[in-house]
Amino acid sequence: MIGRLRGTLIEKQPPELLIEVSGVGYEVQMPMSCFYELPNVGEEAIIYTHFVVREDAQLLYGFNTVKERALFREVIKANGVGPKLGLGILSGMTASQFVQSVEREDISTLVKLPGVGKKTAERLVVEMKDRLKGWGAGDLFTPATDAAPMDSMPTVHDAEEEAVSALLALGYKPTQASKVVSQVAKDGMTSEQLIREALKSMV
């Protein structure tokens, strides 16, 4: 099992990144809550990973800390929640918001996440409420700054396209993704800033 990668960040295409370790490039999918904290392309990164083996693919999911990964593993233990849905859940809101929503049995907030209907939200609450006690939600994710570091400033059109693509990868519908990105877009925003504002507006 691959549990940790330390190497050079080669590419960032939310929610996926490419990291080179000893000459080998690893494709890693990462929740946006973690993605915002990545260093610039060309810099060293340390990523804690969850390795998934399927019949048709081998996938890596990445996190900045061991505790973030542990929360992801708790989320995907819930009945009907796989890694892709877990990625969307932890991208659609911060860890603190997720833990609080589960503890408060806030179904109306959970159903706003991509791929989460009422039944899934209810299962998350029932199955995870006791398991999440004492997690210290405020420490799970480091708060992201408003200015996401980027190596080069993309054009507005490119940034919006990248943001829409990222939302689609997280499970949002095309019309919803395009609409919300257009609503939050402002001149000079990077794709990561657009994604963050779009996700905020939908929860």
Curated annotation (Swiss-Prot):
Residue ranges of the region described as Domain I: 1-64
InterPro entries found in the cross-reference section: DNA_helicase_Holl-junc_RuvA_I, Hlx-hairpin-Hlx_DNA-bd_motif, NA-bd_OB-fold, RuvA, RuvA_2-like, RuvA_C, RuvA_C_sf
SMART domains per the UniProt record, alphabetical: HhH1 (SM00278)
SUPFAM superfamilies for this protein: DNA helicase RuvA subunit, C-terminal domain (SSF46929), Nucleic acid-binding proteins (SSF50249), RuvA domain 2-like (SSF47781)
Region (Domain III): 155-203
Cellular localisation: Cytoplasm
Residue span of region Flexible linker: 144-154
GO CC terms, sorted: cytoplasm; Holliday junction helicase complex; Holliday junction resolvase complex
Main location: cytoplasm
This protein's UniProt keywords: Cytoplasm, DNA damage, DNA recombination, DNA repair, DNA-binding
Superkingdom, natural source: Bacteria
Gene3D superfamilies xrefs: 5' to 3' exonuclease, C-terminal subdomain, DNA helicase RuvA subunit, C-terminal domain, Nucleic acid-binding proteins
Transmembrane segments: none
GO BP term, example: DNA repair
Gene Ontology molecular functions: ATP binding; four-way junction DNA binding; four-way junction helicase activity
Chain residue ranges for the region called Domain II: 65-143
Known partners and oligomeric status: Homotetramer. Forms an RuvA(8)-RuvB(12)-Holliday junction (HJ) complex. HJ DNA is sandwiched between 2 RuvA tetramers; dsDNA enters through RuvA and exits via RuvB. An RuvB hexamer assembles on each DNA strand where it exits the tetramer. Each RuvB hexamer is contacted by two RuvA subunits (via domain III) on 2 adjacent RuvB subunits; this complex drives branch migration. In the full resolvosome a probable DNA-RuvA(4)-RuvB(12)-RuvC(2) complex forms which resolves the HJ.
Family per similarity comment: Belongs to the RuvA family.
Main function: The RuvA-RuvB-RuvC complex processes Holliday junction (HJ) DNA during genetic recombination and DNA repair, while the RuvA-RuvB complex plays an important role in the rescue of blocked DNA replication forks via replication fork reversal (RFR). RuvA specifically binds to HJ cruciform DNA, conferring on it an open structure. The RuvB hexamer acts as an ATP-dependent pump, pulling dsDNA into and through the RuvAB complex. HJ branch migration allows RuvC to scan DNA until it finds its consensus sequence, where it cleaves and resolves the cruciform DNA.
Domain-related comment: Has three domains with a flexible linker between the domains II and III and assumes an 'L' shape. Domain III is highly mobile and contacts RuvB.
Entry protein name: Holliday junction branch migration complex subunit RuvA
The species this protein was found in: Vibrio atlanticus (strain LGP32)
